[in-house]
Amino acid sequence: MSNERFIPDPAQAALFPDISGNTINGLGEVMARRPRYVYWGNDPDEIAHGALQRWFYTVDPGLAAYADVRRARAEVLNAALGPLATDTDQIAPDDWHQFVARSVSVGDFDKAGVTAFDPQWAFEGVEIRQKNIIILGFQHQYDEIKKAPAPEGGLEVMRQYLRAARGAKIVASWLRGHGWDAEPLTGPMSGKVTMIPPALAAGFGELGKHGSVINPEFGASFRLSAVLTDCPLPVDVTADHGIDAFCANCRVCEAACPTDAIAPHKQTVRGVEKWYVDFDRCLPFFNEHQGCAICVAVCPWRRPGVGERLVLKLAKRAERLASDDDAAS
């Protein structure tokens, strides 16, 4: 629990709808269903919290670079994809892995994973025809994101969303050049698909207590974009690094949250027991600061190199506990 109690701006508080964002998200629902748009709606007029989404853009962060990055992202989003080749190439696994390695080396993205698309990941009312989804990761610069919730931290998030938009288009255009149609998806708008579940399925890591994916290399300090395609690429697998159990015993992000939005235990959301961040508590602070990312900035996994050492430490501990159990049986 944060020592300072956050009190929302009355002008913003007056815009909250009667329905809770947690209700829209399915908090407490025991039956599985698709997600519904709760924020970052493609059309604010079509979501209950649309007035709050519009209010977000009235806040002046005090940095001219915000507008510059937004303009640059708009240019990327409006740019045409590469042409679709008439002949379809069969992309060998080695060719895909070489493309990924080359793209990472030049900074187009920092990580990629592939998994079969699950229709449950699409928002209600959205039908996805493609069979596979490629998830791309874009790591924050540590020295910038650690400034959150200062405007510089939010600016770093925006820079990575710019990279995410560009990276998704690069991958989609590469696939189209091989004759495979591909559709790029990028934030911060919700788009067609919720990206965290496919990121978990594609081996990006595990869900953290703060509601973000924690990766051994990047911590939770990265953004996502995606590409939908029918191209039969080699799929990745989920990974258990002991992160979930670590979060159960860690209270760093929970204690740092200025709105007490991070719960100490898992909750049921649309039929799944998982870590969940209280939307109604999180949003006002997020809006008034043009973003937040405090939970990501304080996460023990955030520092470069720390996550990989933690994974090794947790693995050794698990082996030791398993040996003790064997000896006791």
What feature does the model see in each segment?
Residues A101, D110-R320:
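Catalytic cores of enzyme domains
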